[in-house]
Regions:
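Non-catalytic, polymerase-adjacent accessory regions of viral genome-replication enzymes
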Residues: 1-46, 341-342
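Short alpha-helical scaffolding segments that buttress acidic/His motifs in well-ordered protein cores
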Residues: 20-24, 88, 164-169
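Active-site substrate-recognition loop segments, prototypically the cytochrome P450 B′-helix/B-C loop
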Residues: 26-108
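Conserved polymerase palm-domain catalytic core
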Residues: 44, 50-52, 60, 70, ...
Length: 342
C-alpha cells in the first residue's frame, strides 16, 4: 500500500483547524476551558497553527481522573488545544486509517459502533458451530510505541508529521517511557484500534475460521470445530506475544455457539440479543432515581419523562421489553411512561 504523504502545513491550515475546533467543542461549550478558548478563538488557533508548524505541539497537559463504570479505568483528558490538534490530524488522515482496517473491526469507525458489532456477533453465532472469545490484558497500557510507530511509518510519510505523532505518544506514555496510550483521547482510540489490525488479519487467514468481530480489544470469531478453535486461539496468542508484545487475559472462552456469548455489555444468543447484568442494574438504578425525584416533588412530569427517555438509551440495541415491564411493575406501573392508556 502506498504511503500517504502528510505535511504539518496541511494540518495547520485554517479551515482544518476551524473544523477541528468545532468538533472538539461539540457538546462542551459550557466547560470553562472550552469557553475560554472559544472566546479568543482566532488568537488561540493562530497560536496552535504556529506550534504545529514550528514542531512545538502538542502542549501535553492533561487532567487525570478515575471512573468505575463498568470497571475501574484511569482517564486522561487532554487540554482543549491538544484535543483540537488531534481532530485536526484525523481530519486529514482518518480515511487512511479506515483503509488500514478489516471490515469486521467496529470501534471508532463511522457507520460501525457497538450495536453493529453485537449484530455481527449474532450472525457469527448463527453461522458457525463453535466460537472463541478473548480480550487483551491491560491493552492500552501495554502498547509499545516502537511497534506502533513502525506501523504508522508503513502507512504515512513526512518527517514532520511522523515526529508529531511521536511527540503525541511521548506525552501519553502511561506505563513508562515508550509504552502505553492514555484512555480518553481521540488519537489514542485510533492508534489502539489500528494496532490490532494485524491480529485481525492473522485470525482471518486461518483455515476453518470466520465470523470475526473485534470491538477495540474484545475479539470473537467462529470456528468449524473445537479443534480449529483451540488451534486458532493458540496461534493468536503466539502472534500477539511475538509481533505485538501483548498477552491475552486468562479468561478466554471456547464454546458452542448455541450457548451464546456476552459481548460489549449484551447477552447475545442465536435468536435474540438481551441486556447484560450491568445494563440491567444501570437501568434499575435510573428508574429508582426518577421515581424518587417524582415522589419527592423534585422534578416535574416533563423532567421525569426526559429522564426516562435518557434511561432507555441504556437498553438500546437489544430486546428489553419484558425486562422493562418487570422493573416498572416493581414501582406499581403497568405501562411505560409516555405510553397511551389504550
Amino acid at each position: 500500500m502506498k504511503r500517504q504523504a502528510v505535511t504539518l502545513e496541511a494540518i495547520a491550515e485554517r479551515p482544518n483547524l476551524e473544523l477541528a475546533c468545532w468538533k472538539a467543542a461539540r457538546g462542551r461549550q459550557s466547560c470553562p476551558a472550552v469557553a475560554r478558548f472559544l472566546a479568543d478563538r482566532t488568537q488561540q488557533l493562530d497560536a496552535l497553527a504556529a506550534a504545529i508548524v514550528d514542531e512545538r505541539a502538542p502542549d501535553g497537559r492533561a487532567s487525570r481522573f478515575v471512573i468505575h463504570d463498568p470497571k475501574r479505568r484511569v482517564i486522561h483528558a487532554a487540554c482543549f488545544a491538544d484535543r483540537v490538534l488531534h481532530h485536526a490530524i484525523f481530519n486529514v488522515v482518518e480515511a487512511r486509517f479506515e483503509t488500514m482496517l478489516v471490515d469486521s473491526s467496529f470501534a471508532c469507525r463511522p457507520g460501525k459502533g457497538v450495536h453493529r458489532a453485537v449484530l455481527a456477533v449474532q450472525r457469527s453465532l448463527q453461522r458457525w458451530p463453535w466460537f472463541v472469545q478473548v480480550d487483551v490484558d491491560g491493552y492500552f497500557p501495554s502498547i509499545r510505541h516502537d511497534l506502533l510507530m513502525a506501523l504508522l511509518r508503513r502507512r504515512f510519510k513526512g518527517a514532520g508529521f511522523l515526529a508529531l505523532l511521536q511527540r503525541i505518544l511521548d506525552c501519553g506514555a502511561t506505563a513508562g517511557p515508550g509504552r502505553g496510550l492514555p484512555i480518553g483521547t481521540l488519537a489514542s482510540q485510533h492508534f489502539a484500534n489500528a494496532f490490532l489490525d494485524g491480529a485481525d488479519r492473522f485470525i482471518l487467514d486461518q483455515a476453518g475460521v470466520g465470523g470475526h468481530v473485534r470491538y477495540m480489544d474484545d475479539l470473537l470469531w467462529g470456528c468449524e470445530s473445537r479443534a480449529v478453535a483451540e488451534a486458532s486461539l493458540a496461534g493468536l496468542e503466539a502472534f500477539l506475544r511475538d509481533a505485538c508484545g501483548l498477552r491475552l487475559k486468562p479468561r478466554r472462552r471456547i464454546a458452542r455457539s448455541s450457548e451464546g456469548a456476552r459481548y460489549c455489555g449484551f447477552r447475545v444468543r442465536q435468536g435474540v440479543v438481551l441486556p447484560g447484568p450491568r445494563k440491567m442494574a444501570r437501568f434499575r438504578a435510573a428508574v429508582a432515581r426518577i421515581e424518587a425525584a417524582r415522589t419527592a416533588g423534585w422534578a416535574s412530569e416533563a423532567d421525569c419523562q426526559r429522564a426516562w427517555d435518557g434511561s432507555l438509551a441504556t437498553l438500546s440495541g437489544c430486546d428489553s421489553g419484558g425486562f422493562r415491564r418487570r422493573v416498572l411493575a416493581g414501582f406499581g406501573y403497568s405501562l411505560e411512561p409516555g405510553c397511551p392508556s389504550n
